[in-house]
Amino acid sequence: MVASEKSKILIIGGTGYIGKYLVETSAKSGHPTFVLIRESTLKNPQKSKLIDTFKSYGVTLLFGDISNQESLLKAIKQVDVVISTVGGQQFADQVNIINAIKEAGNIKRFLPSEFGFDVDHAHAIEPAASLFALKVKIRRMIEAEGIPYTYVICNWFADFFLPNLGHLDAKTPPRDKVVIFGDGNPKAIYVKEEDIATYTIEAVDDPRTLNKTLHMRPPANILSFNEVVSLWEEKIGKTLEKIYLSEEDILEIVKEGPLPLRTNLAICHSVFVNGDSANFEVQPPTGVEATELYPKVKYTTVDEFYNKFV
């Protein structure tokens, strides 16, 4: 596709964790790329630096807010595709995006803020269950309104989970002992953030992903917790002491711990105890798999990912 034929993409939540990767990939792929930002974001030193980077890619900044219907509608009328990457506190506010898309009438595809695990297959405990339920509610609303969509299921963000194996306070993989959630046997899936962005932007104009759930399941990256630890042990030539956190232990911490830890552990319970990331088949016609659709994309394997930490 030449640039003039590529869809115009609006990213809402573009300065967030996964949003910034999508903005960069969209712009560098030749899509006219727009980012909705609050004017107050410019006053944040870290975010303003990121916004300068966006400008260097040729991104158009549109000032507005997900809670301001007028600014939302104005932004949406300028594009073909809307991608939302808003965080959990704003999942419910995506109703405003749905209403604006409905009113504008010009959107060819909406990608709501998914970018995690398939909430239609997950069996999460609180506080993750409420977050997943909000995503489910948004899905059903999109479908009921007849808005063209793609749901992006990328599973674990590799850069978020693999460097610390779920221990949020660590910056590098362990070299002495490791805590493993559950028995470590259920398979999970890990995808590098840059690859998530590449597959997502590939999908926006692809008729094969229209009204479908796009699952990212790179074959080399479907690994159990035990397999990830073994791979790391091979890299460093050392056997780690393994502490297995039982389901009972996890449930106890989820009850008593601080909220960010509770949410993270509840998601870990869903993935590593229930196996919700990979315990189901991608079912056509509603489900499609990214590495099968885009075999030319060279994804980063978990094995390659760990090389930089050795």
From Swiss-Prot:
NADP(+) binds at residues 13-19, 38, 47, 139. Keywords: Alkaloid metabolism, Cytoplasm, NADP, Oxidoreductase. Gene3D superfamilies: NAD(P)-binding Rossmann-like Domain, UDP-galactose 4-epimerase, domain 1. Monomer. It comes from Nicotiana glauca (Glaucous tobacco). NADPH-binding protein. Involved in the biosynthesis of pyridine alkaloid natural products, leading mainly to the production of anabasine, anatabine, nicotine and nornicotine, effective deterrents against herbivores with antiparasitic and pesticide properties (neurotoxins); nornicotine serves as the precursor in the synthesis of the carcinogen compound N'-nitrosonornicotine (NNN). Reductase involved in a late step of tobacco alkaloid biosynthesis. Triggers either the formation of a nicotinic acid-derived precursor or the final condensation reaction of tobacco alkaloids. This is Isoflavone reductase homolog A622. The active site is at residue 135. Coiled coil: none annotated. Belongs to the NmrA-type oxidoreductase family. Isoflavone reductase subfamily. Induction: Stimulated by jasmonic acid (MeJa). Induced by wounding.
